[in-house]
Amino acid sequence: MTMITDSLAVVLQRRDWENPGVTQLNRLAAHPPFASWRNSEEARTNRPSQQLRSLNGEWQFVWFPAPEAVPESWLECDLPDADTVVVPSNWQMHGYDAPIYTNVTYPITVNPPFVPTENPTGCYSLTFNVDESWLQEGQTRIIFDGVNSAFHLWCNGRWVGYGQDSRLLSEFDLSAFLRAGENRLAVMVLRWSDGSYLEDQDMWRMSGIFRDVSLLHKPTTQISDFHVATLFNDDFSRAVLEAEVQMYGELRDELRVTVSLWQGETQVASGTAPFGGEIIDERGGYADRVTLGLNVENPKLWSAEIPNIYRAVVELHTADGTLIEAEACDVGFREVRIENGLLLLNGKPLLIRGVNRHEHHPLHGQVMDEQTMVQDILLMKQNNFNAVRCSHYPNHPLWYTLCDRYGLYVVDEANIETHGMVPMNRLTDDPRWLPAMSERVTRMVQRDRNHPSVIIWSLGNESGHGANHDALYRWIKSVDPSRPVQYEGGGADTSATDIICPMYARVDEDQPFPAVPKWSIKKWLSLPGEMRPLILCEYAHAMGNSLGGFAKYWQAFRQYPRLQGGFVWDLVDQSLIKYDENGNPWSAYGGDFGDTPNDRQFCMNGLVFADRTPHPALTEAKHQQQFFQFRLSGRTIEVTSEYLFHHSDNELLHWTVALDGKPLASGEVPLDVAPQGKQVIELPELPRLESTGQLWLTVHVVQPNATAWSEAGHISAWQQWRLAENLSVTLPSAPHAIPQLTTSETDFCIELDNKRWQFNRQSGFLSQMWIGDKKQLLTPLRDQFTRAPLDNDIGVSEATRIDPNAWVERWKAAGHYQAEAALLQCTADTLADAVLITTVHAWQHQGKTLFISRKTYRIDGSGQMAITVDVEVASDTPHPARIGLTCQLAQVAERVNWLGLGPQENYPDRLTAACFDRWDLPLSDMYTPYVFPSENGLRCGTRELNYGPHQWRGDFQFNISRYSQQQLMETSHRHLLHAEEGTWLNIDGFHMGIGGDDSWSPSVSAEFQLSAGRYHYQLVWCQK
C-alpha cells in the first residue's frame, strides 16, 4: 500500500522540478562505473558481472499532458490503456509528443525556475524479480544512466527518490523497497524541469529514459569509490600508478585493499594495504580510504596514436585473502600538462584534430548503442581525427571506454548551457543556481576521471561567464590537477579556462563584438600577457555544402605552435526519419514535427549525414589533418611525420606519374619514419613525353595491413603536384569541310555533315543542336550568375526575419535571380574555315544593367564549337555566385567522365583534397543529396568533360544532374525533388567559394569572391 508520504499528491505538491535547490533526493554519490565482481579474474578480463543486471527492454508506458493528470492508482498497478515501449528510447520517437529542434531560443517560456503547467509526462513501469540471494545480504541499487529531464521513482508503491541532469546517472538504493517474488518499478518522467534551463543546447529536445537502466548488487561492506592516476619521472621511463580507494560499510581491522595492474595476461605490479591514510589536518585522516602506489618500469604510454591499455583490478578482501568484491578499470599511462603556452601529452605538444559530436541517431533519437558509437569512432580515426568534444554534455559511459581503447582525446563537457538567457550568465552568476551547476560538474568528474582518453574538462557551453564558473574551475583544479579545464563562455579567455577556446574565431579577421571580442586566432596569441594555448572549441561550421577555407586554418595551426588545432562543428547531421503516407522514409529537420519554436535545418551541420554516409567535406578535413606532410624538390620527395609517438611500421608510399590521367610510371616505397621525423625518397627518371597534356605526380600513403580502426589498404594521406605546364587547348588545323550558314528572320543555322546548330536571332542564345534528327537541347544555352543558395549563403535569413547582409538577400535585392537578358548584338559571319556567331547581352533588372556578356561561337569543319565569353560586372552589384553557362541537355546518360579534380564534389575554397585525374562516375553520384537542397556537385579544374555524345574542353568547373538550380532553390527537402527531363549542365568559368568559418555571417574569404569587374573564359564543345 502506498504511504501518504509516498503518494503522488505529495510529490506534486512539492514540485521538486521547479526548485533549483533540489537537484536530487536520495540519489547516491557519483563514482566510476561499477560491476561488483566476486571473482578478480572476471574483473581483470572484464567479463559480464553476475551482480549487474540490465533492465533494458519492454516497459509499460502511458503518456500524460501534465503530471497532475497521472492517476494515483498508477503507483500500484499498470493502467488499462498502457502501451509497451522499449527502454532506452525517447518517447517522441514512438509517436508521443513532438521533438522540438531549437538552437538558442528556449522551447518553453523563460521564467526560471518555473516550467509550463502543460508539462508532458511519461509514466513507465516494469515488473521484475530479483535473485533471492540479493535480498538476504548486501545492497541492491538501480542505475539510470540518462533520463530527460527529471523523474521520480517508486518501487512497490513506495517513493524512492528524485533525480535530474539528463546526461549523468542517477543511482538509488532499492534494498529497503524490494521483496521476494515480483517487484514493480514506477518512473514518472517530466519533459520540463528547472534543469531544462541549464540544458539549452543546440539539439533536438526529447524526453524519456534514453540510456540504460540496470540493477547492481553490492556487498554490505563495499568499494564505494576509487580513483587512479599516473605519475612519471622526467623521461617517462618510470611511473607510479596511484590508486585511491574508498570503502563503505563496517570498517574492520581485517579489511585490506589490493590493487593489481595487468597488461594482458601479465601482472605488472601489485600492492596491498589496510584502510587509513595520511594525516589531513589536526583531526586526522580518512579512516575509510587508502592510497596505494604501484611502481612501473618503462610503462607503455597511452596516446590516441598508440592507445596502450593496462587493467587495474581493485580487490576488497579480508586479511586472510577472502574476496569481498572487486572493481576494475582500464588504465592508460599518460600525462597532460600545459607548459610554456603549449598543451603537452607525454611531453609532446598536441595538435588537436578534433570534432564535436552530439549523441544522435536518425531512427532512435538520442539513444546510443555500441555499434553506433564504434561506427563514429572508426569514422573519426579513418579520417584523421584524434580528438572529440562531448558536445555539450557527458556521454554514455561506454563512449569513454571505447575512446580509451581505440585512441581518441576527449573533452568531457558538463551538461550546462544557458544560451537563451539574457544575458547568458543570468543563471551562472546567480548563487541560487550554484548547487545545480556544481552537481553537473563534480559528478561528471567523479564518474569519468579514470579514463585516460579524457584529457580536458569543460565547464559547459554558451552560458556566459559567472561566479559559479570560477568556483567550479577552482574545484576541479583542486580535485584533479592532472587535467586542464576549458570554458568558452564570456569571451573564451576568462579566468575560468586554462586554454583560449573560442568558437568560430577566424584566422586573420577580428570580430570586435562588445564585451566579448572575438579576435583572429593569430592576434589572440599576441595579446599582452597572454601565454595560454589556443584550441578552437568549435570552428569550420559544416552545415550543408560547407567547409570552405578549412585549409587556411590548418596552415595557421602548422605555422604557429600555440595554435593547437580545434574541433569542427560537427560530426553528424541531426536529421530524424519520418515516413510519408506510403511508408517511405524521409529526413526531417526543425519544424517538420509541428514543433515551435524551431530553427529549421540548422540542426544539420555534420561532416556526415545522420546515417553516417560522408559529406564530401569530410575528405577535405581528412586531407588537411593528415599526419604525413610532403615536399617535392626535383625528383626528391621529403616525407615528414606529424605523429608524436607512432613510428611508421604499416605504411607504404605509392607514387604515380600520369599524363592527363594516363599512368606513365609508378612505384612504392616502405615508409620508415620516426615520430616527428623525415624520410627522403628519390624518384627515378621519368620517360620522355610524346604528347601534350598535364603531367601530375600523386603520392598516397597506404596501410597494407588492417588495424583496429581500418581495413587493409586504407589510405591515410595523399598529395599531388603538377609537374609540367604544357596544356594545349589550341584547335586542330583547319579541316577540309566548311560548315554552311543559313540565315532566316528568326535564326542562324549552321550545318556540317549530320550536325546542326541553331541560334535564335531574337534571344541571341544557342537554342538547339541536332545530331542527325535528334535534338540535343531542352533549353537554350544561357549565361548563369546565380546558384541555389547554400546554407552559408542564407545565414540567419528567413521569411519572417530578413538578414540583408546574407549573400542570398544581397543577390535577391540586386536582382541577380530575376535578371533578364536584353540582346544588344547578334551577328553571323562566314570565315574561310568556320562560321562565327557573335552575341552581346545585357543582363538587367528593373532597368539596371548588372552584367554584360559578350560571346563568340566559332564552329569549324571538325564540328568543334569554340565558345569565348567575356563578362563585365556592374561595379555597384554584389559579387556574383558564379559566372558561367547553363542548359538542359536532352540526353540522360548513365555515366559522367571528366579530366579534372575529383572524384568528390569540390569548390574553389574546398579542393585541396581533390586530385587531378580522369574520373568516371554514375550520373547519380554527381549529385550530393544534402537534406536541405542547395547548389552541389561542382567539380573544379576540369580540362575535359564527356557526357553522352558530347565533349567539352577548356579550363572550367561544372556540375551535372537531373535537378535544376531553380528546383534546388525552391525545394525544402531532398525527398521532394523530382528528376527532371534530360540533364542539367552548369559550366562555370568562375565560381565563388562556399565559405564555412560559420554559417550565419558571410564567411567566403575575399580571395574566393568574384570581385573583379571583368572575366574571360573559353571552352570547346564538340560531339564525339
Curated annotation (Swiss-Prot):
Q: Which residues form the active site?
A: 462 (proton donor), 538 (nucleophile)
User: Can you tell me which residues bind Na(+)?
Assistant: 202, 602, 605
What does the cofactor section's free text say about binding? Binds 2 magnesium ions per monomer.
- Per its UniProt record, what Pfam families does this chain match? Bgal_small_N, Glyco_hydro_2, Glyco_hydro_2_C, Glyco_hydro_2_N, LacZ_4
Q: Where is this site: Transition state stabilizer?
A: 358, 392
Q: Does the keyword Metal-binding apply?
A: yes
Which keywords fit this entry according to its UniProt record?
Answer: Glycosidase, Hydrolase, Magnesium, Metal-binding, Sodium
Q: Which reaction does it catalyse?
A: Hydrolysis of terminal non-reducing beta-D-galactose residues in beta-D-galactosides
Give me the residues that bind Mg(2+) 1, please: 417, 419, 462
- Cofactor(s) in the UniProt record: Mg(2+); Na(+)
UniProt lists the family membership as follows:
Belongs to the glycosyl hydrolase 2 family.
Subunit-structure text: Homotetramer.
Protein's name according to its UniProt entry: Beta-galactosidase
Tell me which species this is from. Answer: Escherichia coli O157:H7 (strain EC4115 / EHEC)
* Gene it is expressed from: lacZ
